[in-house]
């Protein structure tokens, strides 16, 4: 038995789905497109299950939110979505610069700095992470976490080394 928190996102569009996930033991439901299309639902989720049970995924290209699996770009600034969701009761956010996701370039530090400030540090950063030094910089900037996929898959980041290094800096 492993004690691990599980966060699930993708296709969650109603209160029933959130309830079902939480009943199964999921720690947090990650809401994306629905946060743009039905902000009232996000507010209801926060009221019914508490703000710890939800995270909003802010997927952005050039500072504007993308929805529907990144297939549709909106005219909604990412910062405005965060503001609206904070008013709805959301505390934790994931920010992905989708133009960098999977590219092994580097994170969009300027956007992440803004998002960290706007979320009081309750931000998980994603997109473009390619090396351990970038994870350490994200921790220094105040991000509470990071999503690393491609860099672990390619071997550019050793997971055990990253966990050890980040634990030493409190990240």
Language-model features, listed with the residues they occupy:
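Alpha-helix-loop-beta-strand connector modules within alpha/beta enzyme cores
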Residues: 1-7, 39-59, 104-131, 170-171
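Catalytic cores of alpha/beta
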Residues: 2, 6-7, 12-28, 110-148
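Structural motif corresponding to alpha-helix initiation and N-cap regions
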Residues: 15, 36-39, 75-79, 109, ...
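Conserved anion-binding
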Residues: 19-22, 26-101
């Amino acid at each position: 038995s492993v004690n691990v928190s599980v966060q699930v996102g993708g296709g969650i569009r109603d209160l029933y789905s959130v309830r079902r996930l939480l009943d199964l033991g999921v720690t947090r439901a990650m809401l994306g497109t629905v946060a743009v299309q039905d902000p009232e639902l996000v507010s209801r989720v926060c009221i019914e299950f508490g703000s710890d049970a939800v995270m909003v995924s802010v997927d952005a290209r050039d500072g504007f939110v993308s929805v529907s699996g990144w297939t549709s770009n909106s005219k909604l600034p990412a910062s405005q979505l965060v503001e609206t969701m904070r008013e709805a009761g959301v505390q934790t956010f994931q920010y992905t610069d989708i133009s960098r996701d999977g590219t092994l370039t580097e994170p969009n530090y300027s956007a992440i700095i803004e998002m960290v400030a706007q979320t009081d540090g309750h931000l998980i950063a994603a997109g473009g992470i390619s090396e351990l030094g970038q994870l350490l910089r994200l921790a220094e900037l105040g991000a509470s976490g990071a999503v690393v996929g491609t860099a672990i898959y390619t071997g550019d980041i050793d997971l055990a080394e990253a966990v050890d290094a980040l634990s030493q800096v409190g990240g």
